[in-house]
Regions:
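Internal metal/ion-chelating core segments
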Residues: 1-13
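C-terminal subdomains that position terminal phosphate/3'-OH groups for nucleotidyl transfer/ligation
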Residues: 11-174
Length: 174
């Protein structure tokens, strides 16, 4: 349960069935925050062939490790951090930020920036002429808009932007 020992265990041939770690460098894992999420994800990033399920880790942790590895990218801008949160959730973003030793995600949370549908200044009820999936499409368009223009996340400004965003989206769809 301590991935920081992987290097030594691999050298002794103890993990051959679980990890094919050609040239994987597990040094430095012990310097990371002492959470299972952080250390197991760092092991996955250093050895992409690593299968967390082989260690019988909880399914939720395995999914988080895999998602974080799939969406991993260093040097994100603030807008890219917001998109990551919007698309994959706070947990994945916090984990990546911890691994990259940045407080960008924490700052976004502290400011209360709009990164989820729940944080939008409008709701589906503000679009009575739309039905079903069209309501969801509109709200997602407005979320993308709010991610790019955080100062525009007011009911008045989003309702004003909605018709042109909808028209542009439907032009692309046709």
């Amino acid at each position: 349960n301590r991935p920081e020992y992987f290097g030594r265990m691999l050298a002794e041939g103890l993990l051959g069935a679980c990890i094919r770690a050609e040239n994987a460098d597990f040094s430095g894992l012990s310097a990371l925050p002492k959470t299972p999420e952080t250390r197991w994800t760092a092991a996955k990033l250093r050895c992409p062939a690593f299968d967390p399920a082989a260690f019988r880790l909880p399914a939720k942790l395995c999914r988080l490790i895999e998602l974080t590895a799939q969406t991993w990218r260093e040097g994100r801008t603030e807008a890219e951090w917001k998109r990551l949160i919007a698309e994959h959730g706070w947990e994945t973003a916090h984990l990546q930020a911890d691994l990259q030793r940045t407080d960008a995600v924490r700052q976004i949370g502290l400011r209360g920036d709009c990164v989820t549908l729940r944080q939008l200044a409008v709701t589906g009820a503000d679009f009575p002429t739309l039905c079903g999936k069209d309501v969801g499409r509109m709200l997602h368009l407005l979320l993308v808009y709010a991610l790019e223009h955080p100062d525009q996340n007011t009911k008045t400004q989003l309702l004003a932007a909605a018709p042109s965003l909808w028209q542009e989206e439907n032009k692309i769809q046709d």
